[in-house]
Design a protein with these regions (language model features):
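Solvent-exposed, flexible loop/coil residues
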Residues: 131-134, 141, 156, 172
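N-terminal alpha-helical interaction blocks
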Residues: 8-137
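Cys/His-rich short segments
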Residues: 147-177
Length: 177
C-alpha cells in the first residue's frame, strides 16, 4: 500500500494514521454486491426461487436479531419458506449481494403493524436497533444489517425528486432512484 502511495506522490496527503485505528465493524465484510445482477430485470424472481437465498428483515429501521440465552446475538437470515405469511405482502426488496454461495436480500416490512409483527418469527428473535447490538455482532452480520438499513433509509428519505418534486421510482434491485 505504501509503495503505491509513494509512486502516486500522495505521501503528504495520505492519512496513514487510519491504518493504526480499530477496524470499522460496518465496513467491508467480503459481501460481493454483484452490481451486474442488479441490472437484470428478473433478479427478484430468480432470487425468490433460489434455495440459496437468505432474507434479512428490516422493520422501521430495526433489524431482526436472534438473541440466544447463551452466546452472542446474531442476524436472523431466513429462507423464503421461513418468512411468516403476514410478512410476505411487502414489495420492498433490495438485493444486497452474495457471499459463500448464498444470496442476500433485504425486505422492508415497515408497513406491518406492531401487533402482527412477531407472529411466526423465531422465538429468540426481536427487532432491535443496530446501535444497541451492532458492536457485539459478528462483522458480517453487522455489515449486512447496516447496509440493508442504510439502503432502506435512503429510499424512504428520497421518495420525491429534489428538483421537480415528482414521485421517484426505485430500480436496479433497490440501488437506484
Amino acid at each position: 500500500m505504501t509503495l503505491i502511495i509513494y509512486s502516486l506522490g500522495m505521501v503528504d496527503n495520505y492519512p496513514f494514521h487510519l491504518f493504526n485505528g480499530f477496524p470499522n465493524l460496518y465496513g467491508f465484510s467480503g459481501l460481493d454486491r454483484r452490481s451486474v445482477e442488479r441490472d437484470k430485470p428478473n433478479w427478484k424472481k430468480k432470487l425468490l426461487n433460489d434455495p440459496n437465498t437468505r432474507f434479512v428483515l428490516n422493520w422501521r429501521s430495526k433489524s431482526l436479531i436472534s438473541e440466544p440465552t447463551l452466546g452472542y446475538p446474531s442476524a436472523v437470515k431466513l429462507k423464503l419458506e421461513e418468512i411468516p405469511p403476514n410478512l410476505e405482502a411487502t414489495d420492498q426488496y433490495v438485493f444486497l449481494g452474495q457471499k459463500d454461495a448464498l444470496w442476500y436480500v433485504g425486505i422492508d416490512i415497515s408497513t406491518v403493524d406492531e401487533f402482527e409483527l412477531n407472529k411466526g418469527l423465531p422465538e429468540d428473535s426481536s427487532f432491535r436497533d443496530l446501535r444497541e447490538v451492532g458492536a457485539i455482532l459478528d462483522r458480517f452480520d453487522a455489515c449486512i444489517l447496516s447496509y440493508c438499513r442504510a439502503i432502506f433509509y435512503w429510499q424512504q428519505n428520497n421518495k420525491f425528486c429534489g428538483v421537480c418534486g415528482s414521485k421517484t421510482a426505485i430500480s436496479k434491485a433497490g440501488h437506484q432512484i
